[in-house]
Amino acid sequence: MSENSIDIALVQETYLKPNRPKACSIAGYVQLRTDRTYSSKGGTALYYRRSLHCGPINIPPLTNMEATGCRLAMTGHSTLVIVSVYLPSPKRLLRRDLRALFALGDAVILFGDFNCKNIRWGCPSNNYNGIKLDELEDRLDFGIIAPSTSTCFPMSSHIDPRR
């Protein structure tokens, strides 16, 4: 990551478990993670360069989302809260989960896999969570930035995401 000048990386669906606390550590980076303990898969992680003025934050209890976060202090700017979020696809997007995360600070950025599909963001179709997130964008006063290309590459696919 340092070769590509990455300061912060956010990961969802880590599949990491508490019995391997040093799994996936990266030299020169602090690893924060929230492992799913009640079943397989899931989990979130956040890596930040050791030289940054970052620190872990406590995530409030969430009903359907999984999250890991930090506070980033920057000279001349207010503190920024950065959160890696995973919403498993069978779970519903809940307003209370989003509100709890946005309440972590004055400037909060949520990155992650929300499993929300909406044609407004370039998806071929909508799903329940995509419609709900689109509605909540106005009600809770936040913005959505979605990638311009697909981020899902099924295992059976012959697409190489590195190209």
Pin down the residues of each PLM region.
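A shared catalytic/ligand-binding motif for oxyanion handling
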Residues: M1-R163
